Swiss-Prot record:
Pfam families: GatC
GO biological process: glutaminyl-tRNAGln biosynthesis via transamidation; regulation of translational fidelity; translation
Catalytic reaction annotation: L-glutamyl-tRNA(Gln) + L-glutamine + ATP + H2O = L-glutaminyl-tRNA(Gln) + L-glutamate + ADP + phosphate + H(+); L-aspartyl-tRNA(Asn) + L-glutamine + ATP + H2O = L-asparaginyl-tRNA(Asn) + L-glutamate + ADP + phosphate + 2 H(+)
NCBIfam families: gatC
Coiled coil: none
Function description: Allows the formation of correctly charged Asn-tRNA(Asn) or Gln-tRNA(Gln) through the transamidation of misacylated Asp-tRNA(Asn) or Glu-tRNA(Gln) in organisms which lack either or both of asparaginyl-tRNA or glutaminyl-tRNA synthetases. The reaction takes place in the presence of glutamine and ATP through an activated phospho-Asp-tRNA(Asn) or phospho-Glu-tRNA(Gln).
Subunit and interaction comment: Heterotrimer of A, B and C subunits.
Keyword tags: ATP-binding, Ligase, Nucleotide-binding, Protein biosynthesis
HAMAP family in alphabetical order: GatC (MF_00122)
Protein name: Aspartyl/glutamyl-tRNA(Asn/Gln) amidotransferase subunit C
Species of provenance: Petrotoga mobilis (strain DSM 10674 / SJ95)
EC assignment: 6.3.5.-
Source organism, top-level taxon: Bacteria
Keyword ATP-binding assigned: yes
């Protein structure tokens, strides 16, 4: 796969961002460099190597236990948001039209 100008323009539209022509070129160059690096990584033989979740071994959990906490300003935040529905923030959906 190669990142070309057409793909950058499509990503720009999906991301709803504006880029100058020089920024488009820089991003195209950077993404292609990442893909080339991925090709190098793909060639590494990992047969027989055990998968790991983290490179650090944890003998005990360092994560705290989840605890439900009440949040006093929740209603204020929801009421100040431009659009809300059933007590939740409402945001525009992301729909991809393949024809565009």
């Amino acid at each position: 796969m190669e990142i070309n100008t057409e793909l950058i323009k499509k990503l720009k539209k999906l991301s709803n961002i504006e880029l100058s022509p020089s920024e488009e070129e820089r991003i195209k160059k950077d993404l292609n460099a990442l893909l080339e690096y991925q090709k190098i990584l793909d060639k590494i033989d990992v047969e027989g190597i055990e998968e790991m979740v983290s490179p650090i071994e944890f003998s005990t959990s360092i994560l705290r236990k989840d605890e439900v906490e009440s949040f006093e300003s929740r209603k204020k935040i929801i009421n100040n948001f431009p659009e809300n529905k059933d007590g939740f923030l409402a945001v525009p959906g992301i729909h991809v039209n393949e024809e565009e």
